[in-house]
Structures are given as C-alpha cells and as structure tokens.
C-alpha cells in the first residue's frame, strides 16, 4: 500500500490541533506533526499576502487520501486550503507498515 505525506497549513495553533486530533480520531492518519509557525508569502487574488501559519505533516495512505482531503476542506477556514500529497518512495518498513495498520478502515481492523 502506498504511503503519502500530506501537507497543509492552518492559521493558528488551536485550529491545527483540532484538525490533527480529528484526522487521528477518524483513522485517516497514523500521525500528524503540528510544526512550528512559519511565515508564508503568497499571491492571492492579485495581491501579495503574508501570514504566519502552522504547518501540518500528515502521514496517511493512498486509499485514505480522498477522505483526508475532504476532512481538511471541512475543518479548514480558508476558501482554498493548501493540500499537497507527496508519495513516500522509501522509509523504514516497520514504520510504513504501522501507518498502513493505523489508517486501515474500521472494517479492515
């Protein structure tokens, strides 16, 4: 099964913690790293914007990706949230297996 690293950013620590907890509770992710705040600079609707954001690094599997994306869209306050999925091409086999087990649909447990 393919492991994915999904990246998103939240506007504050409180919303980042809520999203991380929801993804774990719903078994959509095995682990969510709530990272240190970062400064983002981007163009939005023709204007250069700057914002302090809280990055999330979400470990999941390809079969759960659509549900992860849906949950992020549901819980994220932005109109167009960053949602980027990066395939994991290598890793400690035991860790990748753990991700697969934790993200298994309840009927597969």
Where are these regions (language model features)?
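Positively charged, small/polar-rich N-terminal and surface patches that mediate targeting and assembly
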Residues: 1-109
